[in-house]
Amino acid sequence: MPSILTALARSPTLRALVIVAVAVMAVGCASLDSRARQLMYRPTAARPEPLPTLRPGDEQTLVEVAGHDGTTEHVALWWLPNADRAAPTLLYLHGTFRNLYRNHPKMEALRDVGFSVLAVDYRGFGDSTPIVPSQRSILADADVAWAELVRRQPDSCKRVIYGHSLGGAVAIDLASRKHVHVDYGALAVESTFSSLVDLAGSAVGPLGPIAVWLSSERFDSLAAIAKVDAPILMLHGDRDDTVPIALGRKLRDAAPPGTRWIEIPNGSHSRLHENAPAAYRAAFESLIASLCSQR
């Protein structure tokens, strides 16, 4: 079992959680919640150089939303349509740190499999309004993207909710509030965890969960996934050093019967589409083939 020091060395997020936990215990100050969220989600607005190359017909738009203080804020959406107009549409929910500019290669891999891709940058990320994200704001932004998904894809069984890492928790929460066939066709999650408390505790011991419990964030996917009534695809790499595969398996065990679980040998946290492109493609092609089959 890796030591606490080894885990801390590997993950800046987990190091940050421990720092926050110690600070909160020492100071006992609720105002540190904002700092905790900054360190948990590590929002990035930076654009990489060079910028990703978009295809003709791709769109980047900003949607107006109300901020917590009543001001107007913006949520950035990307639309990457498939050449096949009959293709299903995948709602792409990303994880911490990397905004959509840095998620573009994975989004393209999913488009190449056979999806049109609608993606959202939560506020604090990419071209969206720069704020310190929270679970509440992230879920609200996912709802904004959901409304656009419904507009873009009128056939409910061709809507797929997808999330990577933290985005998997967002996707599970969203799916738990919708219904198969009525609202969407399937849920797919990649490299995600059972709960934020479990993630912190598995890597740094007792201080990690303390940091989470002293913040306003939970992302309890264990509780939410039991409410999902659609087909579920779960992928996880056995070399994931950000979200241990044990947490993916724990989530799998709590999922409804029939959930499809795929472990990628030597698979990393963010590059399963590159670590095992054939297996990755086959998993999603199988998902596409099953859509609308039981309507």
Regions found by a protein language model. Name each.
Residues K106, A230, P244-D253:
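Short alpha-helix in the alpha/beta-hydrolase fold that links the catalytic acid
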